[in-house]
């Protein structure tokens, strides 16, 4: 008799995705982040659900409802901080996952990669609207500044901003709709993640060497289930260390002050995971130019398959490209640091240089380096 997991219509899908899936025998721990992102998403949906039971999306009570969750709800503080710091863990896993894709040439799976970029945008949108909900100073002014960027769009900009606000300023209507978006988007992310996985399983996983691995496959379970569980343990350990010992380490103290439209904080800045894009936005003195650079900094990932000029898929055997990749990582860390600094000398200049370097490395230096490496293969 055939095993039920191979015949049952529902279990068959799970079986083909997580149990009997043929996986390359040499994929490293860099391939763990897909499953970790899945765990992060489940964790965020569950903690978010319990927070939504006590949260009120009204300008008068939003701030106090978050305080009420932390003070009066049973284990409300841990749920709140798991949700807030869970977002940080989510983005750490996301950046490492994308970095892995760039390093090992996984972007040649076009459908998987493009849906991944859409997922990145969706997660960023979710995090942005979520940051507005506690209705602290940084929530309010972050929402005001970022939504205001849309006014840079010629002709329809101002109307668009007021349409998103639901009025002439960030107010009750804005908060209510942002809560609605923040509730629905994670489920859209979950659906997109399934499509992401569907397309990945059409081709099978890439591997560190970037060569076909059809001749050497092993079942996903037990090998990679055990390996993933180890990753999950590390994820939960680091998250709980953050939540229990330094819950406000990555937050902004300004967000413990209730939103006040009459008082602008001295430094308006987003959460740490948006700082690199914020630095690129600020490095251009023109409003529309800054907005275009901001969008391009993420959208540039779509171009990666077109910019791939190397005869080898992975960077494993390409030392020059490896150097460039790590320079790019250092550049992104520099941008992240600059995004959190005040707009004054020397930070403005450093930000502008780092922004130019970011686009220069991806659009010009990487394709040229790959071509040089191709010619070196002939020797």
UniProtKB/Swiss-Prot annotation:
InterPro entries to which the protein is assigned, alphabetical: Cyt_b/b6_C, Cyt_b/b6_C_sf, Cyt_b/b6_N, Cytb/b6-like_sf, Cytochrome_b, Cytochrome_b_C_euk/bac, Cytochrome_b_N_euk/bac, Di-haem_cyt_TM
Keyword Ribosomal protein appears in the UniProt entry: no
Names of required cofactors: heme b
Listed SUPFAM superfamilies: a domain/subunit of cytochrome bc1 complex (Ubiquinol-cytochrome c reductase), Transmembrane di-heme cytochromes
UniProt KW Iron keyword: yes
Job of this protein: Component of the ubiquinol-cytochrome c reductase complex (complex III or cytochrome b-c1 complex) that is part of the mitochondrial respiratory chain. The b-c1 complex mediates electron transfer from ubiquinol to cytochrome c. Contributes to the generation of a proton gradient across the mitochondrial membrane that is then used for ATP synthesis.
Name this polypeptide is given: Cytochrome b
Gene designation per UniProt: MT-CYB
